[in-house]
Amino acid sequence: MKKMLSVLIAAVLATQTLHAFAETSPVGSWQFAYYHVPGGGFYANQTICFKEDNTWYSSSQAGWKGAWFQNGDDLQWNGSVPMPGAGSANNLATIAMGKLAVAGSMSGNYAEWAAPSALPLSWDRHYTYTMTYKGATCAAPK
């Protein structure tokens, strides 16, 4: 009886640990809303899918993809997206740094710039962002 009780307690604790990890992991589909800096005016919504292999992609913006890194509640994700007229390669580099505030929500700062490009940059934009968890299933990349 004691052994069965010990196994049951261990199973409950393991389930709670996995549940806590799932709440803080960014893996899954997120609604990404970003806002102009300065001013705070709304700019756009996108859908981002964070994958278990530490890569991500957009299911709403064609070709936008990259890699992500998490340290505790800090999340950094960077990548690139084809953008006609942006720099000599028609490409934007992107980076976001934020925090997982509570389960299902994160926010931070986001920037995009023409890459490669001569200074002064022809495209250099800065935003704040919020993200809301949509679910474990991601739509296909656009």
Predicted feature residues:
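Generic structural detector for well-ordered beta-strands
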Residues: 31, 49, 67-69, 99, ...
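N-terminal glycine/threonine-rich, aromatic-flanked beta-hairpin/loop signature
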Residues: 40-80
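Repetitive helical segments and hydrophobic/amphipathic motifs
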Residues: 11-12
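Positively charged n-region of N-terminal signal peptides that target proteins for export
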Residues: 1-4
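Tryptophan-anchored aromatic micro-motifs
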Residues: 23-42, 58, 64, 68, ...
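N-terminal signal peptide c-region/cleavage motif recognized by signal peptidases
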Residues: 15-17
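Beta-sheet ligand-binding and adhesion/scaffold domains
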Residues: 34, 40, 74-142
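N-terminal helix-cap/turn-to-beta initiation motif at the start of protein domains
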Residues: 19-31, 47-51, 135-142
